[in-house]
Amino acid sequence: MLFNGFRARRMVVVMGPGLRRGDRKMSPDLVFILTLLLRMAVTAAFVVSASIITERSGPVIGALVATLPISAGPSYVFLALDHDATFIANGALASLPINAATIWLSLTYVVLAQRHSALVSWGAAAAVWIALAAASRMFQWTLAGGIAANAVTFAICLPLLDRFRHVRMPLITRRWYDIPLRASLVATLVATVVTLSGWVGPYISGMLALFPIVFSSMMLILHPRIGGKPTAAVVANGGWGLMGFGIGIAVLHVATLRFGSAAGLCLALATCVSWNLALWWTGRRRLAH
């Protein structure tokens, strides 16, 4: 009886609640890692598709694809899965002046790439972006202030970029590591934004989400291969696309506050795509006439 009683109690312990085979739960750390890897894989697949389109379409279409939310879009989608609508709206507000910083990065690179190496041109452009991003933290941004910063920036930079847009493009020979490298860089950025968002808050997350990783990888990969002027032409053609991207960020802020994160993200994406399609259509009509 004692043996049977001990055995019975032992069976209760072994088969008790929480320890049955069907009730075993995955470790929270493992769930986080697997979820993060899945998000990185989805982002990488998105970047690979966009990169193939960019390389096969010439400087104008390539620039329009590059200015779609290829890296910022996945970052914000995954942030929306982890945070509420207020977080996303505040992040978008912080992203507005960063979009202005990106056009200054583009102008700096385009000017320097005419005569200097990829590392020098990109390094100086990245330094400008970092300085402007750091300076933006000194201000309490509003929607009107962010829009004004973009309006002034584009009014200055777009005319200066225009003279660099038209260059004969050489044949681009792709290396086997180009797209995997670009995809891994963007996936790493998304992973960094998602992982740090809980600690750094919406404003830093919004800044990090707009780090110009797609433009940077394009500069560093294409410049040594086809030269500074053709690469600068691709970047210069992206100026008008960045304007639409800025409008999309403003739409994200307003729509998220009114309708929630899902609707805000969809409307922001629709804004960016519609803007770039309008640019493409306008360009085709000009060529036709």
Predicted regions mapped to residue ranges:
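Structural signature of hydrophobic alpha-helical transmembrane segments
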Residues: 31-43, 65-66, 84-101, 143-153, ...
